[in-house]
Each structure stands twice: as C-alpha cells, then as structure tokens.
C-alpha cells in the first residue's frame, strides 16, 4: 500500500528493475537513483527525450548505473554481427535495413490485455460479456487436474495462481487504478474507457504509451545504432 518507498529505503537492495507503464518510467527511475539504487528500465528508457536526459544527468551525478533493457543488446546473434563489422569481414557499411516480422493478429498480442471481470463488446449488452481470464482459469484447472508429470503440473499450478490473482482485480481494481493516477475517459465513438482498462492496456493510449514506433520501431532503430557504433 506504500508503493515502492519501502523498497527504495531498504539498504540491502542495490538495484531495481523498472517494469511499469512507460509514462511512469522516469519518476520511478529518478526516485530509485536518488535513493542510491542502480536502475535497469524496460524499453523505452522514458516517454520523452527530456525525461531521458534528466535520468542520465542524475545517474551521472550519483555515479550509478542506468541501463535500458533493449533485448538486442543481450543477443549473441547481434554481438556476432558487431564483431564481423569490427573485423572488417562485411566490408564498409553503407546501408542498414532492419525489420522484425512478428505476425501479430489483432487481439492476440500483449497490447490489448484481457480485463478482469470481462468486458462487453461495443454495442453489445450484458449477455454478450466475454471474460477471457475466467475462461482461462477454467481451462487451467482442467489441465492441472489431468496433468500427470509433477514438473509440468507445478508449472501449470503457478500459471493458474497468476490467473486467479489477475482475476481478483475485478474486485476493487478500478478504484486502485484511479488511486494510482490512471483515468476514465470517454472515447469519440461513445465507448467509455475505464481507468482499469488504461492500466491493463497502457500501450494503446497516447497518455501512457509511446505508440508503434516506441514499442516496435525502437528495436529496429536500436539495431541500427548497435551496428553503427561498431564502426
């Protein structure tokens, strides 16, 4: 209930990982560094360039590590490509083409997460409510019951526990989202978006996310930067 203040006050903790919605990265990272903690943020580093610069200045002033978890920096494939460039094996670098084929289908990625308690389609009625989380719990319960392998069963039980905890946010989740600064909003088409939906689907909203270029395009820009820095 006290947020992360107690965590940052713990002298036994040396570093933190920032895994909150993008618009909160800067504030949490700055608070952590002011408390003397090293920081690893998920990408992007922050929502605005100004926030990134401020984070960098504080890290330098406090002599702390501040890193961003762009996955390409931890890939042996990209590390090998960097070495090939440094060795001159690829010749002179004139052009970089970066692409990543995810094959995402609408509604089947991590951007439009299911809402605790389910949701009614736009234009639908209560009888049309679809609860993907509750359905997932039922499916996992069946899988746990049928699984014979102890290791596989334990993994399924862990996933089931996550779904049950996720589902519990249907009770009080909206109020807690409002308390943490997320907002209700009326969309132009007449659809009412709750604070809980803004929290669960923060990548979809301009106030909380950075859009396609931030979430996906940044990987390709980062790849180009990695290779250019090898020159």
Give the positions of each predicted feature:
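N-terminal glycine-/serine-/threonine-rich beta1-alpha1-beta2 phosphate-ribose binding loop
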Residues: 1-35, 50-65, 115-174
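ADP-ribose/adenylate-binding Rossmann-like module
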Residues: 35-48
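Short strand-turn motif at the edge of the Rossmann-like AdoMet-binding core
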Residues: 43-45, 69-72, 100
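Rossmann-fold dehydrogenase core element
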Residues: 54-72, 81, 90-96
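Active-site rim elements
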Residues: 68-70, 203-214
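Oxidoreductase and adenylate-handling cofactor-binding alpha/beta cores
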Residues: 75-97, 110-114, 159, 166, ...
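Rossmann-like NAD(P)H-binding beta-loop-alpha module
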Residues: 77-142
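Active-site-adjacent bridging/hinge elements
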Residues: 189-203
